[in-house]
Amino acid sequence: MFKFSCADFTFPVLERTAALKLVKLLGFDHVDIGLFVRSTHFSPIDLQAAPQSYTAQVLQDLDDAELRASDVFVQIGVDPSERAANDPSSDIRIKNREVFLRALELCVAVRCNHLTGLPGVFHSTNARERDLETAAEETAWRMKECACAGVQYSIEPHVGSICEEVESARAFLRRVEGLTLTLDYGHFVMAGESSALVHDLLPFASHIHVRGGAPDRLQTSVEENAIDFTGMLAGLKQLGFDGFLALEYVWVDWNGCNRTDNVSETVLLRRALESQIRRLTEAS
C-alpha cells in the first residue's frame, strides 16, 4: 500500500548523477525532484534556457540511475518570499507562470503525475486578504494547467507561508476547491502544533514529506523525533492513501537543517516507518 521515494536534494553536496545513484543504492525506485533556483541538481533557470536538451538529459540521468520521478517540486525564488506565487507584481506573476509551465512540461516528460509548489507569503505592502486572494487565484490556475496535463498539483504549507498553521492551511483549502497538500508535519510541529492537529490535514494529502522533527527544530534525527508517525500512518491507511511517502531530509544552512547525517537518517527513518507499517498491517 505505501510507496517510498527519496528527495534528490537530500544530498546536495553530490553532483546530480551521483546523488541519483545514491538514492537508488539506498533502495529507492522513485525520486522526488527538487526544481529549485538554489539546487545543485535541477535548475528551473537552466530548464527555461534550453528546455528540450535539458529535459532529455534529465530523462537520461533518471534512466541511468534506474529511477522514476515521484514528484517535481518547483520553487522559483531563492527563498519562498522571492518571486512567490502571489507576488504583488503582475509582471513577476506572469514570469512565474512561464517557469511553472516549463516545470509542468518536465513533469509530463519524465512521466511523473505529481507536482508540488509553494502557496505564497504575506507581503508588507499588501493587505493580507489581497495576498490570500492572489494566492488562491494563482493556485487555481496551476491546478487547472496540471489537470489538463494529467498531473496532480499540490501545495506544501510551510513556515513563513500563508499556510503556516493547521488552521490557516484549512482556511486556504476552503478557498481553493479540490486543492491537495504535500504534507510535511515538521513545519507545524516545529511551530509548536501537535501531531494530532496535523492529522486533521491527512484527508487533503496527495504526497507526504517525512523526516524527523520536534518543537523548535524543523529537522532532527530519528532518535530525537517527536512527530507521531504511527498516528500518521494509521490515518493514511484508513484513508486508503495511494501517494508516496517521500524521505525528505535536507542539507542546508537554514533552521539547523545541516546537522544530520542524511544517509544514515534516511535509512533509519525508512526502516522505522516500514516496521510501523508491518505492525499496522498485522493488526488489521
Residue ranges and their predicted role:
Residues 32-33, 69-74, 112-119, 153-156, ...:
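Short beta-strand segments at enzyme active-site cores
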Residues 43-47, 84-91, 126-131, 195, ...:
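Short, solvent-exposed loop/turn segments at secondary-structure boundaries
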Residues 7-11, 36-38, 74-77, 120-122, ...:
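Active-site beta-loop-alpha junctions enriched in small/polar residues
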Residues 76-80, 116-117, 142, 230-232, ...:
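A general structural signal for short secondary-structure boundary/capping elements
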Residues 1-5, 13-29, 63, 111, ...:
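Histidine-acidic metal/acid-base catalytic patches
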Residues 61-64, 78-180, 190, 263-265:
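Active-site acidic/histidine proton-transfer and metal-coordination neighborhood
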Residues 1-109, 180, 215, 263, ...:
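N-terminal pre-domain/capping segments
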Residues 52-64, 138-146, 197-200, 231-235:
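Catalytic-core regions built around general acid/base machinery
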